[in-house]
Amino acid sequence: MPTAIELAEQFQASLVGEAPHGFTGLAPLERAQSNQISFLSNLLYRQQASESAAGALIVSQSDLDFLQANPGANSVKRVYFVAKNPYTTFARMAQYFAKANDPIYASGIHPSAVIDSTAIVPPSCHIGPFVQIGAGVKLGERVSILGNSSIAKDSVIASDTLIYPSVSIYHNTQIGERCIIHSGAVIGADGFGFAPDFSATGGEWVKIPQTGRVVISNDVEIGASTTIDRGAMSDTVIGAGTKIDNQVQIAHNVIVGSCCVIAGCAAISGSTKIGNFCIIGGAANFAGHLTIADRTTVSGNTSIIRSITEPGQHFTGVYPSMLHGAWEKNAAILRGLDKIRQRLRLLDKNKNSGS
């Protein structure tokens, strides 16, 4: 078990207090025990932190000052890891402890896997049961592909990427290093492209061949049952470090920048470009052919129908979307709309009665 001193050095935190024992992992404030670490990154949980039984807390300097001045009824002897960003330090420490419990996929190929003779599969890879790997596929070192996943022809998957069961990766897809793709994801299906050919008596929708690729950069995580369509003629691109939640739809020719986060059930229409470091809430949706500036935040269920050109703005609203501050003001007015209506009726009644 790592000691407090070892953890403080590894995660560049200042250590306050002494712990005679090591730590087994992390836990929530209300459940943590003396051999576990918890964290405080929200003022609302200060009192709960003061009463926690955790043997160590990751805190900011201001939170440490509060906790030392308000020890709480529990009065547990604990140590503090003082960090500039407690939440980020918690995340990195959680990664550290999780590695000890992560399943290790031993290298080797399950006998039920079907691998084309032209595919390149290094000996360090793990290929699970009933996996299909097509012609011309190239896998990097230590790639793990779990059961029932399918990798179609000429796709390239770089080293240390993990693909969970029942993932479908279509042809010519490019996936970078250290990516994680969860079950049910479909990468590289045809984009939704059809041209109308109608007359007064009938017609049809003419399918446009989708000849582009999906290109996924390094350190991307893609949630369960998310779908990313291949480009029509150019590529659909996901930037490095971007994290995509479950059941997200990304249409053809979309470009998502680096280090974005996209929450569940969001939908991005074709040819829209999302900047770097954007935050997209759950079930937010974007019209096609838009450009979204860097560091834009879009609240959940918000509809974006116009490009956003100024970086760092926060948009909220079903229709129309607007700056978050303006939406809050309008929402407050909307809550009092019935009272305003009653007052106007009374004023109108008094006016008509001459009083």
From Swiss-Prot:
Classification via Gene3D superfamilies: Hexapeptide repeat proteins, MurE/MurF, N-terminal domain
- Residue numbers annotated as active site: 252
CDD domains reported in the protein's UniProt record: LbH_LpxD (cd03352)
Question: Under which EC number(s) is this enzyme classified?
Answer: 2.3.1.191
The pathway entry for this protein reads as: Bacterial outer membrane biogenesis; LPS lipid A biosynthesis
Q: Name one GO molecular function term.
A: N-acyltransferase activity
Class of enzymatic activity (EC top level): transferase
Name the chemical reaction catalysed here.
a UDP-3-O-[(3R)-3-hydroxyacyl]-alpha-D-glucosamine + a (3R)-hydroxyacyl-[ACP] = a UDP-2-N,3-O-bis[(3R)-3-hydroxyacyl]-alpha-D-glucosamine + holo-[ACP] + H(+)
Where is it found, in Gene Ontology cellular component terms?
A: membrane
* Top-level taxon: Bacteria
Keyword annotations from UniProtKB, A to Z: Acyltransferase, Lipid A biosynthesis, Lipid biosynthesis, Lipid metabolism, Repeat, Transferase
UniProt-listed GO biological process terms: lipid A biosynthetic process
Pfam families for the chain: Hexapep (PF00132), LpxD (PF04613)
Similarity remark: Belongs to the transferase hexapeptide repeat family. LpxD subfamily.
**Described purpose of this protein according to its UniProt entry:** Catalyzes the N-acylation of UDP-3-O-acylglucosamine using 3-hydroxyacyl-ACP as the acyl donor. Is involved in the biosynthesis of lipid A, a phosphorylated glycolipid that anchors the lipopolysaccharide to the outer membrane of the cell.
- Share what the entry says about its subunit structure, partners included: Homotrimer.
Q: How is this protein named in the record?
A: UDP-3-O-acylglucosamine N-acyltransferase
Organism, scientific name: Polynucleobacter necessarius subsp. necessarius (strain STIR1)
